[in-house]
From Swiss-Prot:
Pfam families: F-box, FBA_3
Biological source species: Arabidopsis thaliana
Xref: InterPro entries: F-box-assoc_dom_typ3 (IPR013187), F-box-assoc_interact_dom (IPR017451), F-box-like_dom_sf (IPR036047), F-box_dom (IPR001810)
Residue span(s) of domain F-box: 57-107
Location of region: Disordered: 1-57
Disulfide bonds: none
Bias (Basic and acidic residues): 1-12, 43-57
Protein's name in the database: Putative F-box protein At1g32660
SMART domains on file: FBOX (SM00256)
Top-level taxonomy: Eukaryota, Viridiplantae, Streptophyta, Embryophyta, Tracheophyta
Amino acid sequence: MKRKDDDQEDRSCSSASKLDPIPLDLKMATVPTKSHMKKSHQNKLEEDEKEDTNPSKLELDSLPLDLKMAILTRIPAKSLMKLRCVSKMWSSIIRSRGFIDSYYAISSKQSRFIVGLSNAAFNEPEKQLTFLFSFSHEDGEKSSSSSLVPNFEMAVPCSLAGLSHSLASFHGILAVEGKVMCNPNTEQFTTLPVGTIFVGYDPIDDQYKALGFDFDKRCHGNAIGHKVWTLGGGEGMRQIRGDLAPYRPILLPNVCINGVIYYGAHTLSQTKDPVIVCFDVRSEKLSFITAPAVVLQSGMKSILIDYKGKLASIVRNSCGGCISSFVFWILEDPKKHEWSRQSCDFPYSLWDYVGNVRICFFGTNKAGEIIIAPMFLSRDVRSFYIFYYNVETKTMRRVRLRGIGSDIEFRRSYGSENKLCNCHVRIAHQHVESIAFLKDHINLRT
């Protein structure tokens, strides 16, 4: 009965609370490289300030630079994008590395999550889009049951239609299925090199890199080599060599934790032992971590996530097509390859809210709660829920994402009206707002 009331509330929202149709403004660009606000840039800001002689700006421009930056850090990100047009000096401040870092540090105290909806109604790649919506984690973490209102951010020209396709956030920049990187706040995106499989971020050097494979032509699917692109600095693709034996990657979403990309694989030995492949983004070194056989399973029966800075695997147990429980494996010691495990039960009431739709585990929030949500919008118009599972207390709470797929107008606007095609859902957890300009930071050469 509660779900029906929620649906009724969604449909009765005033027009002011509904999402607007798609304001498509897709911009090509390029992504982030490391730099700091050096003295030369300080001089540039002062020069820009001298050039702006409009009397209406003099009062603001006479403020000390530190005070100007302190004021600007309190302004919403998308409003800052408009303020770039006020003067050259304001634009220089907003685009400076020092200000970008300060803004990110403040934004990191209030993380958000991004929901990506990908329509599969068109076969032509150029017509496939992923729509990105942002939500605040803060309200949901303070109550046992609540609803959140979405903000439409932007659309990017790629699809999330595959089971292994993922949406991930790296230091304020989103990676959409190894094809596109974008910043929702600047509404810029850039296409990743062809052949990219995974994207990782090194927090020490503030560097993004893409990883791809060379596959054995005689036995497709066996990785026998690796190629890397540095997303920034103008470097082209390069081969990296390691002493790893050939292996076959498992089609699972990867996870990047503290500058290391983790993904599943099977060795090509007679026993086909499951392993976790580790790629250190900074050193570009590869290594194996052995894992229990059940930790890595294809077909989304298991999934790797970041749990409080540790690699974890969730292995689902099904009963009658519904997940009844899951086993939670945590890599406690990467050097000794030691794992811990615990069993977690699902309350059957969850299925009252998601219907007959496959669910997935999309990482955790800052509190360490596992985020669970449907992988598709229901083909019937109904409210969309996500769930937070606390592994320590074995409790779960639900949060309704208002407006997402809950009325026909939304579905028509965002390409999910066709009941014959799935609208795919992916979630990037713990996203932090950044105002980094892609064209200032990622310079791709393939």
